Amino acid sequence: MKFKHPALLLFIAGVVHCANAHAYTFDASMLGDAAKGVDMSLFNQGVQQPGTYRVDVMVNGKRVDTRDVVFKLEKDGQGTPVLAPCLTVSQLSRYGVKTEDYPQLWKAAKTPDECADLTAIPQAKAVLDINNQQLQLSIPQVALRPEFKGIAPEALWDDGIPAFLMNYSARTTQTDYKMDMERRDNSSWVQLQPGINIGAWRVRNATSWQRSGQLSGKWQAAYTYAERGLYSLKSRLTLGQKTSQGEIFDSVPFTGVMLASDDNMVPYSERQFAPVVRGIARTQARVEVKQNGYTIYNTTVAPGPFALRELSVTDSSGDLHVTVWEADGSTQMFVVPYQTPAIALHQGYLKYSLLAGRYRSSDSATDKAQIAQATLMYGLPWNLTAYGGIQSATHYQAALLGLGGSLGRWGSLSVDGSDTHSQRQGEAVQQGASWRLRYSNQLAATGTNFFLTRWQYASQGYNTLSDVLDSYRHDGNRLWSWRENLQPSSRTTLMLSQSWGRHLGNLSLTGSRTDWRNRPGHDDSYGLSWGTSIGGGSLSLNWNQNRTLWRNGAHRKENITSLWFSMPLRCWTGNNVSASWQMTSPSHGGQTQQVGVNGEAFSQQLDWEVRQSYRADAPPGGGNNSALHLAWNGAYGLLGGDYSYSRAMRQMGVNIAGGIVIHHHGVTLGQPLQGSVALVEAPGASGVPVGGWPGVKTDFRGDTTVGNLSVYQENTVSLDPSQLPDDAEVTQTDVRVVPTEGAVVEAKFHTRIGARALMTLKREDGSAIPFGAQVIVNGQDGSADLVDTDSQVYLTGLADKGELTVKWGAQQCRVNYHLPAHKGIASLYQMSGLCR
C-alpha cells in the first residue's frame, strides 16, 4: 500500500502524542519498500526526533515564553527514552521558578547559561506537545514564586527596539458663503506627535498648528517629555512637560520631574474610567475639545448626535471644554465633567506621586512659578484607604487628608478635606477650605456604572493652584472677567450608564451643577442618551441641555433633542450598506431632518456616505443641504474628504492621517500609531492583511504596524494566511507579544519565500530514501522537512537552484536541484532528485 501525503508522519506523531496512556506498536512492514532503513523504535515509544523546535513554553498551562529550544534524547528513571529540553537556570528563574530553593538544578549546569537538571524539583515534568508546538512544564506550586493575575510574567515584558516614530494628522476646510455678503473662510489644522524609543526610555512630543479665517496660524506644543518604567518599583519616571495625576488634587500642567506609581504594572479588576464626549451638531461641524487649556482633539462630525471616544486625555482629572463650530458660523460650548472615581485600594497597596518643577499654563503670558507636590495612598485593613497630599508653590500652599472605603457590592466611597493658603495677584492673602465626597459603583450583573462627586466650599477664600498661578502674568495685563470673580459654593457632577440588554438598549446620563456664592442661580449641564437595536437596525434618542449664568443674573438655556434611526439594506444590496434618518430639534428653532445612505467597499477599506438634509427655518433656498463623505483606510495611512452644498453655502474638506516608524530595517509607513505598537515583520510576504483591521497590510518588504496593544499583557498579532502570495509560506500565523508602555515590539513571522515543490528522492543505487528522513534546504533557516512513504518530500521557499541535505540515522547524502521550466497543479513544481 502506497501513501501519497507527507503528512502521514505528522499523523503518526499526533497519534503517539495523544495516546500517552496506551501502548501502540507501529509495524514497519506496513510501509512497504519505504520501511528499509527505518528505525521505528522511537515512534513505538512515543518519542519525537531530537533537535531544535520553536515552541511556546507553558508553565502549568500559562504561556511564559516563545523560543527555540534544544531537545536531547535521554532516558528517564525507568530507562525509557524521552526528549528532554535544555533550559537554563536563568530561564527557569524568569519563568517564576524559585531556583534559589533547589541547588541541585546546578548539578549539570556549571553556569546559569547551561542546561539545568529539572529533576531536581520533585514532581516537575517537561513534555513536548508537538501537535500544538508547546513545551508543557508542570511545576509544583510550592516551587513557584507568587504571581499577579491579569498581567503577563515580568520576564516577558518587552521594552521593544530602538525606533523613531511619529503620528501625523491634518485637515483643511474651505467654506464659501453665498447669501448676503459673499465670503470665503479657510481653516486648517495639523498635529504632529513625534517620539523616540531607546531601551526603556520614551521621548514624546505633541505639537499642533491651527489657522481659522483671516487669523494667522498658531503653533502650540501640548507637551514634550521623556519617561521610562521603573519595573522593580512598579513606577514611572517622567522628565519634561506633562500633567500631574488628578486622583487627590486637580491636575496641574508642569515642566519638571515626576516619579509616580504605574497602575498598569499591577493588575486591577477595574481600569480607570474613560470619558466619552457626547453632543448634537446642527450642521456638518468642527468639534474642538480642550482639557486644562490645551486642544486634545479636533474633528469634523456630521449633523446629528456624536460620541467622541478616541480622546487622548491625560490620565488625570480636568473638565473637557467642548466647542462645536457649526457650518453657519454659530457655535455651541459646553463642559463634560471628567473626574476620577472614588478612592479604594486593596489592603497593603501603596500608591504615590512626587513632583517638582515649574507651572506650565496654556497661556504663554502666565508666570512660570515653581511648584512641588506629593501624594500618598495606602490600603488599610477593613477595606479602608487613607490618602493625603501637599501642594506648594509661589503664593500658594495646600494640604489634603481623606479616607476612602470599599462598600463591597454597594461600590466605593471617599471623603476628603483640604485647606489652602493663597494670594492672587494684586489681592490680599486668602484662606479657605473645601470638602469633597466621591462615590462610584460598577455593577457587572446589572450593567450599571455610576459616578458621583460633590464639592462643598466651606469658605470664600478657597482657591485651586491653577486659580492662583494663572492670575500672575508677566505682560502687565491682568485678565479679568466677571465670571472669574465669582466664588463657587458647591459643585456636583454625575455620570450614569445602564445596559438593559440587546432589546431594551443602553442609557447614559451626565450632569453637573455649580452654585455660586453671593449670587443667585447656578450653571447646569445635562445630557441623556438612549440607544437600542431593532430588527438589525439601530435607534437612538439624545437630549442635551446647557444653562449658563450671565452677568445680569439671567440665564442662557439651550436644549437640543435628536432622534436617529438606521437600517441595513443587506437584503437588497447584498453588502454593507445602511440607510439612516435623523431629526435634530434645538430649543431656539431650526429643526433639521436628514436622510442618508452609507456603506463600505473594498474589504471595508472604503467608507462612504451620502446625506440630504432640510432645515425648516432656513432662508429661502438655504434649507436643503447635500453632502458626500469618503474615507480610505490604506496600508500607508488614512485619507478622507467631504463635500457639502446648499444655496447658502458650500464646504469642502480634506484630511489625512498616518504613522511612521524608522527602525533598524528601514522606514515603515502605516495607519496612525496608538499606544504600544507591534512592528510586524514577515520578510517577502507583501500585501498580507494583519489583525483584521481594515486596510492594515504588510508593505513591499513584508512589514507593517499594529497599535492599541495592551501593555504588560499578552497580545496576539495574526496574519491572514489565505492572502499570502503564491511564493510565500509562514511557519506560524500568530505571534504573541507583551509590550511595555509606549514600546515598539517586533512581531517576527518566519517566512519561506520561493517556489513550492514536491520532490521524489532516490539514492545513487536507485533505492528509495527511508521514510522519516530529514530534508534540509541548505542556506535556509527553519525546521527540516520529512520524507514520506513514497520517498517524496514537500519543500517550500526554494530558489531556482540549490542544494539539499538528507539525513537518516547516521547516514546522509546531498541533492543538487534545478527547478523545471513549468509549474504543475496549484503552482507546485513536480521534480526528482538524486541523492549522492
Protein language model regions, located:
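Short Pro-Gly-centered beta-turn/loop motif in secreted/extracellular proteins
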Residues: 78-87, 311-317, 703-729, 741, ...
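Post-signal-peptide, soluble extracytosolic/periplasmic N-terminal scaffold domains
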Residues: 2-12, 16-271, 581, 586-661
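Short, ordered, surface-exposed loop/turn motifs in non-cytosolic proteins
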Residues: 49-58, 62-73, 684-693, 765-780
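Sequence/structural signature of outer-membrane beta-barrel proteins
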Residues: 171-179, 208-214, 242-248, 357-363, ...
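Extracellular beta-sheet/turn segments enriched in Thr/Pro/Gly and aliphatic residues
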Residues: 134-138, 342-345, 669-670, 733-754, ...
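Exposed, low-structure sequence patches enriched in small/polar residues
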Residues: 463-465, 487-760, 766-778
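Feature captures outer-membrane beta-barrel proteins of Gram-negative bacteria and organelles
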Residues: 157, 186-199, 219-233, 368-382, ...
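Membrane-embedded beta-strand positions of outer-membrane beta-barrel proteins
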Residues: 166-170, 205, 237-239, 352-356, ...
